[in-house]
Regions:
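Active-site glycine-rich loop that binds ribose-phosphate moieties when present
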Residues: 1, 22-23, 27-42
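Internal, conserved structured core segments that host functional sites
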Residues: 1-19
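Mid-sequence acidic-hydrophobic segments that form the walls
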Residues: 7, 41, 45
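Short, surface-exposed recognition loops or helix-turn segments adjacent to catalytic cores
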Residues: 14-23, 48-54
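A short secondary-structure junction signal
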Residues: 16, 23-26, 30, 64-68
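C-terminal accessory domains and tails appended to enzymatic cores
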Residues: 45-48, 52-54, 58-144
């Protein structure tokens, strides 16, 4: 989705979240009508330039989904682990934080919504600039 936005194409990232980090085909099939209705609504929206929607579906049957929440981006926190592995070409690689993950974030975060049985919809922008700090940092710098 981020690549699409960089090319000027409105984009939606849709993920199956929560529970085991593997897709259950029966659950995905059950959620098709919910996803179709949600996408019908979301694709009708006019999104600002450089914006994408990050949608996370809870690992529940469609009948158990409690609704949709507009959310803020939470933060996934991985355990402090370093695993030495090999890639498919037999090159040595390191996987950082490959253990179990937890999350942190406010009550209005995407993780909280999904954990509580809601679909989370988080508007994201590609510009990660901390604008307030940028303005403050201009005071730090003087030309040599």
């Amino acid at each position: 989705a981020m690549e699409g936005v960089t090319l000027g194409v409105p984009a939606i990232a849709l993920s199956f979240a929560g529970g085991e980090l593997k897709a259950d085909p029966a659950l995905l099939t059950d959620q098709i009508p919910v996803v179709a209705k949600l996408l019908e609504h979301l694709t009708a929206l006019k999104m600002p330039r450089d914006t994408l929607l990050n949608v996370n579906m809870p690992a529940r049957k469609a009948s158990e989904i409690r609704g949709v929440r507009l959310t803020r981006l939470g933060r996934r926190v991985y355990s402090d682990s370093l695993m030495k592995m090999q890639d498919p070409r037999k090159r040595e690689i390191y996987w950082i934080g490959g253990g179990s993950a937890s999350w942190s974030g406010a009550a209005d975060s995407d993780f909280r919504a999904v954990e509580d049985g809601y679909i989370s919809v988080t508007p994201l922008t590609l510009d990660l600039t901390h604008l307030k700090m940028l303005d403050e940092a201009k005071l730090w710098w003087t030309e040599p």
